[in-house]
């Protein structure tokens, strides 16, 4: 029988969710960020652990770049990104002297930081910890899953885009989840059509429906499609809360629906 982990800094975290993608450029960090914001607007207290060590973009998306990480008796204190302190964030981006500095580290150093992020960040009480992972399936993913395994993460959200290349990569991601014993909470298709900011009509730019079909064939839940939305893009670039500012947008409806589905699955996932 596997030994129980010391609860430590994750003792107050109720649910841990990983966000994965088979390839880069599909908007995985966007989904992580907006899911956290949507859960916050549902009254949940959320933390984001950014383990995308070579591409830490979430501090910029949440207008938190340049903020300092402080030490306490329990370890690192995450950065709060709102006045209510309902979203906290830890990222390697806070540890770099220059935000444009490239992270050129060998595997052992990356693995050590991932383990430190898991054990040494004083999250306090959280309803959800969203873990934004690098794209693909690599040693960093193995290190993340192994470090979190004793704390029984709920599972993974897998992000794809409609194109066939991305769908193929997601098949490999689903295989990774199966081999590592990580439950798939669901598949999210991002960049699914273009939402006009004036009339809200959604036009397919790429093929559509690939993510839903893949989820059906794999026997995992399909959580929804998020369109390309200029208002969402602008919010991320400016570090603004899209969920709060654009409640009438098509992407808002899609993102809040996904958050509702995740919340609805909680009883089954926890059983």
From Swiss-Prot:
GO MF terms held by the record: 4 iron, 4 sulfur cluster binding; ATP binding; ATP-dependent FeS chaperone activity; iron-sulfur cluster binding; metal ion binding
Binding residue positions for [4Fe-4S] cluster: 196, 199
Keyword Transmembrane helix annotated: no
GO CC entries: centriole; cilium; cytosol; nucleus; spindle pole centrosome
Keyword Ribosomal protein: no
Localization of this protein: Nucleus; Cytoplasm, Cytoskeleton, Microtubule organizing center, Centrosome; Cytoplasm; Cytoplasm, Cytoskeleton, Cilium axoneme
Pfam families: ParA (PF10609)
Keyword line: 4Fe-4S, Acetylation, ATP-binding, Cell projection, Cilium, Cilium biogenesis/degradation, Cytoplasm, Cytoskeleton, Iron, Iron-sulfur, Metal-binding, Nucleotide-binding, Nucleus
Amino-acid positions noted as binding ATP in the UniProt annotation, renumbered to this chain: 22-29
Cofactor: [4Fe-4S] cluster
Modified residues (N-acetylmethionine): 1
Primary residence: nucleus
Cofactor note: Binds 4 [4Fe-4S] clusters per heterotetramer. Contains two stable clusters in the N-termini of NUBP1 and two labile, bridging clusters between subunits of the NUBP1-NUBP2 heterotetramer.
A GO BP entry: iron-sulfur cluster assembly
Subunit text: Heterotetramer of 2 NUBP1 and 2 NUBP2 chains. Interacts with KIFC1. Interacts with NUBP1.
Function: Component of the cytosolic iron-sulfur (Fe/S) protein assembly (CIA) machinery. Required for maturation of extramitochondrial Fe-S proteins. The NUBP1-NUBP2 heterotetramer forms a Fe-S scaffold complex, mediating the de novo assembly of an Fe-S cluster and its transfer to target apoproteins. Negatively regulates cilium formation and structure.
Family note: Belongs to the Mrp/NBP35 ATP-binding proteins family. NUBP2/CFD1 subfamily.
Record-given protein name: Cytosolic Fe-S cluster assembly factor NUBP2
Protein's organism: Rattus norvegicus (Rat)
């Amino acid at each position: 029988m596997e030994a129980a982990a010391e609860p430590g800094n994750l003792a107050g975290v109720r649910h841990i969710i990983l966000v994965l993608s088979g390839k880069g450029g599909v908007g995985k960090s966007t989904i992580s960020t907006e899911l956290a914001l949507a859960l916050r607007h549902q009254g949940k207290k959320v933390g984001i652990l950014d383990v995308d060590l070579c591409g830490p973009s979430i501090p910029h998306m949440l207008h938190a770049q340049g903020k300092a990480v402080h030490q306490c008796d329990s370890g690192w204190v995450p950065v709060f990104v709102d006045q209510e302190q309902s979203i906290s964030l830890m990222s390697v981006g806070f540890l770099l002297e220059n935000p444009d500095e490239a992270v050129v580290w060998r595997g052992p150093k990356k693995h050590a930081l991932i383990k430190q992020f898991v054990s040494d960040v004083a999250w306090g009480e959280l309803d959800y910890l969203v873990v934004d992972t690098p794209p693909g399936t690599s040693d960093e993913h193995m290190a993340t899953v192994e470090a979190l395994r004793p704390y029984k993460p709920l599972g993974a959200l897998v992000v794809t885009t409609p194109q066939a290349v991305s769908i193929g990569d997601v098949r490999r991601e689903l295989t990774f989840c199966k081999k590592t014993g990580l439950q798939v909470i669901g598949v999210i298709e991002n960049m699914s059509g273009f939402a006009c900011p004036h009339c809200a009509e959604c036009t397919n730019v790429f093929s559509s429906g690939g993510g839903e079909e893949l989820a059906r064939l794999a026997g995992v839940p399909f959580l929804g499609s998020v369109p390309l939305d200029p208002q969402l893009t602008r919010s991320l670039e400016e570090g603004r809360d899209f969920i709060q500012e654009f409640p009438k947008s098509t992407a808002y409806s899609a993102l809040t629906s996904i958050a509702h589905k995740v919340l609805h699955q909680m009883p089954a996932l926890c059983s």
